[in-house]
């Protein structure tokens, strides 16, 4: 059983501190340089078999949203796992941009930074995994 963190960030951005395991489940992280790569990660077998996905779409320019929004929406709608969206306080969330039918189990917004939202996101997933057994 796996928790997959999909993170859209520049290669120079520091990686969040993630545990190797959470409630006995492996934690894997995929770093993506664009929304196109985020979409590709969501379509990979690794994401399709994950128990939970923590999705950090980061900041993308309007051109990326125009080019990838529809495909990203389709990938999220097909995602079998529940997911948590880590949202930047200064950016609209996925639901506002994509009008999702399969919305996140939770949206975490920390006013300090997206990085600061990781501990709460992991705690939510950890609790849900512990409840699921």
Language-model features, listed with the residues they occupy:
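Short, glycine-/small-residue-rich phosphate/pyrophosphate-handling segment
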Residues: 6-21, 28, 92-133
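Extreme N-terminal starter segment of soluble prokaryotic enzymes
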Residues: 1-4
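A short beta-strand-loop structural module common to alpha/beta enzyme folds
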Residues: 25-38
């Amino acid at each position: 059983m796996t928790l997959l963190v999909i993170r859209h960030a520049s290669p120079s951005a520091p990686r969040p501190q993630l545990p190797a395991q959470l409630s006995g489940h492996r934690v894997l992280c995929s770093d993506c340089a664009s929304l196109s790569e985020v979409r590709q990660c969501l379509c990979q077998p690794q994401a399709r078999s994950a128990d939970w996905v923590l999705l950090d779409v980061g900041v993308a320019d309007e051109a990326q949203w125009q080019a990838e929004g529809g495909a990203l929406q389709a990938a999220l709608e097909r995602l079998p796992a529940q997911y948590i969206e880590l949202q930047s306080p200064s950016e609209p969330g996925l639901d506002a941009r994509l009008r999702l039918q399969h919305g996140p189990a939770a949206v975490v917004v920390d006013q300090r930074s997206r990085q600061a939202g990781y501990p709460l996101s992991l705690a939510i997933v950890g609790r849900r995994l512990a409840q699921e057994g």
